[in-house]
């Protein structure tokens, strides 16, 4: 498996009573597929995995796989700060038919680099599913070294890394990682720079809201149309900034509610977007013409 393209870090729809909205989720996945993305990543940070119980987690993963029906890749979030729990989740997504498991660096415990390596090795050795390493120090409080990333990447079924430390690191990782390992940007604002430094794709938050735009950025870079790509990148950066104006994924869910994709509901300890945040999100969506495009699409159905 060689990962490339745009993968959406999928938001999880909730009803007004905060139960899972399975119908909205299936519809949302279909829309993502029709918009041209390469894959979806359910049950990650944007999917509020921290507030899903295990039954809900399993439901989301199964529904995404069933809805995708092999049309795109499904890389299911399976990470935890507990190695045995991570193994249990990875075994579940393997049995459910996911294409790969996204495994975050253990958070809260703050292990050493050797502890991080042993965590990934234990998960790898207990499963048979391809693994994508997720390095996000702003949430885990650990930024593992390039050497440790290389050691993890040498495990046979590690096929990618989602790195959220900036585009500058991509070239250094490209030089030391095996060819089988895709480097995926975890930062929409620097996705183009990541591609230009040798990155293979992006696991994107903004593609929840603007999947076609995120795919277009990837396509333009692949075609060598860098000036046009820079224009699209500027628009995506503006959208990305407003989608993190308050704790994520509250701004993303509000944007999707304006587009008729899901309710803006999030689970505590997250709260819905403030009125000032709502105004900021709506202004950017209108500036980028995303609301009009969505209304036009619905009018054609």
Curated annotation (Swiss-Prot):
Query: Which regions form coiled coils?
Result: none
Q: Tell me, what's a Pfam family for it?
A: DHDPS
EC number from the UniProt entry: 4.3.3.7
Which pathway, per its entry? Amino-acid biosynthesis; L-lysine biosynthesis via DAP pathway; (S)-tetrahydrodipicolinate from L-aspartate: step 3/4
Q: Which residues form the active site?
A: 134 (proton donor/acceptor), 162 (schiff-base intermediate with substrate)
What function does this protein fulfil? Answer: Catalyzes the condensation of (S)-aspartate-beta-semialdehyde [(S)-ASA] and pyruvate to 4-hydroxy-tetrahydrodipicolinate (HTPA).
What name is this protein filed under? 4-hydroxy-tetrahydrodipicolinate synthase
Q: Which organism is it from?
A: Anaplasma marginale (strain Florida)
Gene symbol here is: dapA
């Amino acid at each position: 498996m060689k990962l490339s393209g745009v993968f959406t870090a999928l938001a999880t729809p909730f009803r007004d009573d905060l139960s899972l909205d399975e119908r909205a989720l299936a519809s949302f996945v279909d829309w993502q597929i029709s918009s041209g993305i390469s894959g979806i990543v359910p049950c990650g940070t944007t999917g509020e995995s921290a507030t899903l119980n295990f039954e809900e987690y399993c439901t989301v993963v199964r529904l995404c796989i069933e809805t995708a029906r092999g049309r795109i890749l499904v890389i299911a979030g399976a990470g935890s700060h507990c190695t045995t729990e991570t193994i249990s989740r990875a075994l579940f997504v393997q049995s459910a038919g996911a294409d790969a498991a996204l495994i975050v660096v253990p958070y809260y415990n703050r292990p050493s680099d050797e502890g991080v390596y042993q965590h990934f090795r234990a998960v790898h050795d207990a499963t048979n599913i391809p693994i994508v390493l997720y390095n996000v120090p702003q949430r885990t409080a650990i930024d593992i070294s390039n050497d440790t990333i290389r050691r993890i990447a040498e495990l046979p079924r590690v096929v990618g890394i989602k790195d959220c430390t900036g585009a500058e690191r991509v070239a250094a990782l490209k030089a030391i990682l095996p060819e089988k390992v895709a480097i995926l940007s975890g930062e929409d604002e620097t996705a183009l720079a990541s591609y230009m430094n040798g990155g293979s794709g992006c696991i994107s938050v903004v593609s929840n809201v603007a999947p076609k735009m995120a795919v277009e950025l990837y396509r333009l870079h692949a075609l060598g149309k860098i000036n046009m790509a820079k224009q699209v990148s500027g628009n995506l950066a503006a959208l990305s900034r407003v989608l993190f104006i308050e704790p994520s994924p509250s701004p993303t869910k509000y944007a999707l509610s304006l587009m008729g994709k899901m309710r803006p509901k999030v689970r505590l300890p997250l709260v819905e977007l403030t009125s000032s945040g709502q105004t900021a999100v709506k202004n950017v969506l209108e500036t980028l013409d995303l609301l009009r495009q969505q209304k036009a699409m619905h009018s054609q159905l």
